[in-house]
Amino acid sequence: MSGHSKWNNIKRKKEKTDGARAKVFTKIGREISVAVRDGGPNPASNSKLADLIAKAKRMSVPNDNIQRIIKKAEGGDKTEFEAITYEGYGPGGVAVMVETLTDNRNRTAADLRHYFDKNGGNLGAMGCVAFLFNQKGVIDISLEDKDADEAMMDALDAGAEDFDASEDAAEVTTDPENYSAVVKALEKKGYEILSDDLAMVPMTTTRLTNPDQLKQMGKLLDSLEDNDDVQNVWHSLENEEDLPE
């Protein structure tokens, strides 16, 4: 699963733009608004909201911002966000799934189609690549000052399915139903959560070697991630580390 880590995506984006922090606030804010609309403003009785608040704090979103978003949603904000997942192929046949929260599906579809067309891909119909992915909980933890073998045992004991360690971090994979419980168990054990999400993990991957296709793929991912309507981008590129900076 190396190369498909959400943490890798976030790190690449943070290195490329000073506006990444504001983008993160916007995206998590939309998720919180939808959670309040669907389940109410009290995290004690709205587990989805509670998970998002914890996630926002891990992403360094100030508590004042979080409370402001909740109050705005509770006060009857008329903006209606709709969750839509778009699917397509990037250059070289790389499968791409794009999760969005949008208040204008026509605008979002047009934007995404433009990004794909401009960068050697094509936006497809619903279901055209979803069968190539499995939903998993993906949790990236810091291994700084931690023993990798001990961390693996802690993750597996918490209910993880897989553990993939690198030099200073590890990617923990879980069943979607166990995802929140594993995050909480690892936090309780003192691990720093670098990122966590319900991810669409590719069952097979595509390796790009053509420099032009790698450049196009990098531009496609950047364009998608920079769009405020886009919440998550999942893809089957095997060698993401080869994308140009």
Language model regions located:
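N-terminal cationic and glycine-rich segments that engage phosphates or anionic surfaces
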Residues: 1-124, 128-138, 235
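Positively charged, low-complexity, intrinsically disordered RNA-binding extensions
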Residues: 138-245
